[in-house]
A protein has these predicted regions:
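Alpha-helical bundle regulatory/interaction domains
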Residues: 1-190, 195-200, 213-214, 229-232, ...
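HTH DNA-binding helix-turn interface
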Residues: 206-215, 257-265
Length: 296
C-alpha cells in the first residue's frame, strides 16, 4: 500500500504525495538496493540533496531539474541515469507526475555501467546511451507496466540483464570504503588510508572510479547526510544536537550541511522538504542490503 502524506508547503497549502519503497529481488540487491515510486497531485518544487547514483523512469507528468546547470524538462518515457551527486539541486513536478526510481550502489555501478562514476557525477543523462540495445525493450516494459508490482518485476529483469559478471571489480576496496562511509565520524581520511595496504594515489583513483569523487569529498558528503538523517529519524528540533566536534566551528558545520543538503540545519528542521523528509522516513520501511541507499 502506498504511503500517502498530507503535507503543507511554505504557504500552508495542502500537498498530497504518495511515496513507497520496494525491495529488488535478492540476486541483485547488492547492486540495486531499493526501488521507489513517487506520485504528486499538485505542483511541487523542492530541493534535492546530494545523493547516491540512481535511475529515474518518468511514468507520467513532467519533472524539471537543474542538476546539469540549467533547468531541463523530462516527460513520460524519459529514462534518466543520475551519477552520484555532490551538491544540491532544484526539482519541480507538475500535477499528476509519477516517477519510478532505483538506487544504484557503487558495486552496482561497477557491474552495470561501463563508465567510471566520476565521469557522470553531478549529471543527468539518458539511460539509453549507457546500456546495450538489447535491453531497450526491458526499459519499455518498466514504463508500460500497469501497476507497481509488475513494474518492480520488470525492473528486476532489466538489471539482471545488465549485469556483467566478467567485469573486474575490486570488491575488497568497495567493502572497505563502504564500511568507512557508513560511519564517517570520527573516521577521517587518515583512518581509511591507515587501514588499507594501498597508496593514497590508488585510493583516490579507485574512489573516483567507484564512488564518483576523491575520498575527502566523499567523506564530507556522507558526514553531512548522516547529520540530516539524524535530524529526521530522531525527530530532533535543535541542530546543535548533531553538530559534532569534527567541525572547526559552528559556521563550518552550517556551510558543510547546506552544501550537501541544500538548506541550513535550522531551515532543514523548519522547512517543507517534502521529498527529502518522505524519502528518509520511507527508507526505514525496508531492509537495505547496502547501507548506501539507506544513508544517501
Amino acid at each position: 500500500m502506498n504511503k500517502l502524506a498530507i503535507l503543507t508547503d511554505y504557504f500552508g497549502d495542502i500537498i498530497l504525495v504518495q511515496f513507497e519503497y520496494f525491495r529488488p529481488q535478492s540476486e541483485i540487491r547488492k547492486l540495486v538496493s531499493s526501488y521507489y515510486n513517487v506520485t504528486v497531485s499538485d505542483d511541487v518544487s523542492d530541493v534535492m540533496r546530494a545523493e547516491i547514483a540512481n535511475l529515474r523512469f518518468v511514468i507520467a507528468g513532467q519533472v524539471s531539474a537543474d542538476l546539469n546547470g540549467a533547468e531541463e524538462q523530462y516527460g513520460p518515457g524519459d529514462t534518466l541515469l543520475c551519477g552520484p551527486t555532490y551538491r544540491w539541486s532544484h526539482v519541480r513536478f507538475t500535477p499528476g507526475t509519477q516517477v519510478f526510481g532505483a538506487a544504484i550502489t557503487p558495486m552496482g555501478w561497477a557491474r552495470l555501467f561501463d563508465v567510471d562514476a566520476d565521469q557522470l557525477a553531478d549529471r543527468l543523462v539518458p539511460l539509453e546511451a549507457y546500456v546495450e540495445p538489447s535491453t531497450l525493450p526491458l526499459i519499455q516494459d518498466i514504463l508500460d507496466a500497469p501497476d507497481e508490482t509488475q513494474r518492480v518485476t520488470a525492473a528486476d529483469r532489466l538489471f539482471t540483464a545488465m549485469v556483467d559478471p566478467a567485469r573486474r571489480i575490486d570488491e575488497e576496496f568497495l567493502d572497505q570504503v563502504t564500511a568507512w562511509i557508513a560511519s564517517p565520524e570520527p573516521n577521517e581520511l587518515a583512518v581509511l588510508i591507515s587501514e588499507m595496504s594501498r597508496s593514497q594515489r590508488q585510493i583516490e583513483r579507485l574512489c573516483k572510479k567507484y564512488f564518483g569523487s576523491a575520498p575527502k569529498l566523499l567523506h564530507r558528503k556522507f558526514r553531512a547526510l548522516h547529520s540530516a538523517n539524524r535530524l529526521t529519524w530522531q525527530d530532533l528540533t535543535d541542530w546543535r544536537d548533531i553538530a559534532t566536534t569534527v567541525y572547526s566551528d559552528q559556521s563550518h558545520f552550517i556551510r558543510e550541511f547546506k552544501q550537501f543538503n541544500g538548506r541550513t540545519p535550522s531551515e532543514f528542521i523548519k522547512g517543507a522538504h517534502i521529498l527529502v523528509r518522505m524519502t528518509l522516513q520511507q527508507r526505514l520501511q525496508i531492509d537495505h542490503e547496502s547501507p548506501f541507499s539507506l544513508i544517501g
